[in-house]
Each structure stands twice: as structure tokens, then as C-alpha cells.
Amino acid sequence: MNLEVKKIDTANARLSTKLSVEDLEKRYDKIAQKIAQRVKIDGFRRGKVPLSLVKTRYQAQIEQDAQEEMIQEVLKNALKELGIETKDLIGSPNFTKFEKKDTHFEIEADIGLKPTIVLDKIQECVPSVGVEVPNEEKINERLKQLAKDYAKFVDTDAQRKAQNDDKLTIDFEGFIDNVPFEGGKAENFSLILGNKQMLEDFEKALLGMQASEEKEFPLTFPSGYHAEHLAGKEALFKVKLRQIQAREALGINDELAKIVLANEENATLELLKERVKGQLFLENKARLYNEELKEKLIENLDEKILFDLPKTIIEQEMDLLFRNALYSMQAEEVKSLQESQEKAKEKRESFRNDATKSVKITFIIDALAKEEKIGVHDNEVFQTLYYEAMMTGQNPENLIEQYRKNNMLAAVKMAMIEDRVLAYLLDKNLPKEQQEILEKMRPNAQKTQVG
């Protein structure tokens, strides 16, 4: 074996070698014998299939297995020559040349190695952090909302007219051209006026009605209505208002605190205010981090943390970004790329900068997560997907299986780890008094959220 290995930088190496066809063919018998032991061919007992028949029937597989065996041997020798352990090899080699000549194969390949990352400049990358601390006005607004949200609905007198924020129980039926339409009928249907559970014009027609009152009114479905058979259609609705209930006002006092903080012993209004302040602070922090600081931190990490990147991984990321982009392209653009290899190469190349940045940030986040012992359990990934399914009306089990089939669970976990690492770095840069607010909230992280 004529092997040449050159280390390009700390994360990349290149090998070139010539492998004799004779060496390849010597491997055929050994591989064919392994195949013969496990295959069953009619007329022969298992393990008794003639080698000549196996070589004929499984020729392509034998050649492929022999080539793979030789390649693994080449890689093993290349790593040995470089003084690198197998665990430091990252990704699959990128074969830039694999040509069969009369007597030998000419092979050239790029090898990716785990990069060396120095994290001593991390603190320089973290932007200054100052989260808005909620004032009394904001706290009182949230308390009023809590008093409203936790208020019970109670029956009203028969003379009351329906108004926004009342809970109504109605029967209704819709007609188009005097014919009832699918999904247009319900009995004992509950809604809260003003919450936009129904079309705005439908809810407006209910305002001012009294219990036991019946009413007919026209309604035009929006042109972009989700049920296509109703979009833009003129309808007539017949409604009977069965019941009106109004919220029973709750005072902002210790009683409210006991209702909201039901799991707390001796809950008081002061404790509730403290929890509300903490909750609002967390919301402000999340908004600031997600809308501004995390992206700024990523830009700083990309700019200031310098190290060699394995080109093989960048190429793989470019392929991934290119494939994903194809799904959102117009059919005409996809066809244009299929018809022109040059255009396809140019389009793929346009993803190089994004791919390089993505790979670099992934390596940095991984190194930081290991150093700070930040991780995500599989159960947390499943919980995240369950929540996504709930919010989008999907079956959770089906969604998880879809992610599993497409090998996307690892990507979800990595995204969650990235989010935690970035938040950890930013939290460390909070002013001392704001870190104290966070510390007060942590023991209550598993308890009832307020608002």
C-alpha cells in the first residue's frame, strides 16, 4: 500500500493512496465465505452453498464490501501515521478521487478531525445584560388579570343583556341557500364574548341578547376562511341564547393569593406580588434574550472564538441546507437546478457561509455544554415535542415518530442545549440584584406559574 498523509491544519488532513486490484481480489474469497455462511439458496443447505455460486450471485456486494474493507484499512493506517486516535476522527471522509485503473485504484480523501477549541475568550463575547424589572404598575396589571382569570362565572338575572366577557350558552344552526351546512350546528355551545372563539360578526350579533331570546342574522364567511366550502359564502344563522353567566369579581387580597397559589401554605398577597414580579421578570428576560441578546452572543462567538473547522463537516452541512432549501423552492427553480449542474453547484455554494457558521457555533456550544455540565434528558425532548403537538393539534406519538424516522431528535436536543448554554452565559452577566431575583424564582420553578 502506497500511502501519503498530510495534515492541513488541526482539524483537517488529506490522504492519497494507490491500492492494487490484486489486493482487492484477494479479499473476495474471504468475504464470499462469510456471505455463504448466512445466505440460503434453494437446493443447498445453509453454509453449503458453492463459493462460485455466491461470487456470481453476490458479485456487486462482494466488491463493495471488499472496497469498504480496504478503505477502513487505509483510514486506520492514515490515523496511525498522523498519531491520531479513531475517536478524534469526525464525520465521514470525503473522497475527492476514487478511480480504478488497470492494475490499481487511485484514492484521495479529505479527513475531518475534532477541532481544538480554547474557551478563554468566552466572557468577552457575552454582551452586557440588563433586564427590565417590573414596576408596581405592571405588577398590579397582572394581579388584575389574575383576579379576572380566576373569577368564577355565576348565573345572572333574566333581564341582563349579553356583553363582552360574559359566558354564554347557545344553540345555533347555519344555513346557506336555506340548506343546513356541515359543521354549522351545535347545542349547548359555550363561549366567552370577546374572546374571538367565533367569527367577529357572529359574536357582535350576540351582544345585547337576553336569556331565552332567539335571533336570526346574516353572516358572510371571510374569503380566507379555513373551511374552503364556506369561504366567501353568505349564510343565515338561527341562534337561541340559553344562559348568560357573568364573572364574580375577585378582590386583590390574600384570598386571591390562596386561590392562585393553591399549593402554598399561608399564601398572602405579598407573596403573590413577589411571585408575579418574578414571573414578569422571567418573561422580560426571555423576550430580551430571544429577540436580541442570544443572536448578538452568537455573532460574538462566531467572530472572536477562532479555531480550525473540519471541512468535511462543513460540506455535509452545505448539503443539508441545500436539500432543505429545495423543499421551499418553486417548481420552476427546482427544474432549473436539475437542468443545469453549474446552477446547482452555484446554489449549493451560496450556503457555505451559513454552513460554516452553523458548524462553528455547534462545536462551541458542545464544548461549553461539556465544560459547564449542561445537558438535556431525552424525556425533556419528548416533553418539548408533546407541547409542540398540543399547540399545533397533532398526535404527539405520531409527531415523535416522525422526528425519529427523519433522525431529527438529536437536532431538537442540540437546539435545546444551545438555548440553555446561551441563557446560562447571559444569566451570569446579569447585574447582582437581578441574579437575586432569579435565585428567588428557582425554588418555585416547579410550582404554579402566576399568569
Q: Residue locations for each model-derived region?
A:
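Extended, domain-scale alpha-helical bundle/helix-rich regions
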Residues: 63, 68-117
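Extended, charged alpha-helical "arm"/coiled-coil substrate-binding scaffolds
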Residues: 2-67, 139, 173-176, 208-209, ...
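Short beta-strand elements
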Residues: 44-45, 85-96, 185, 309, ...
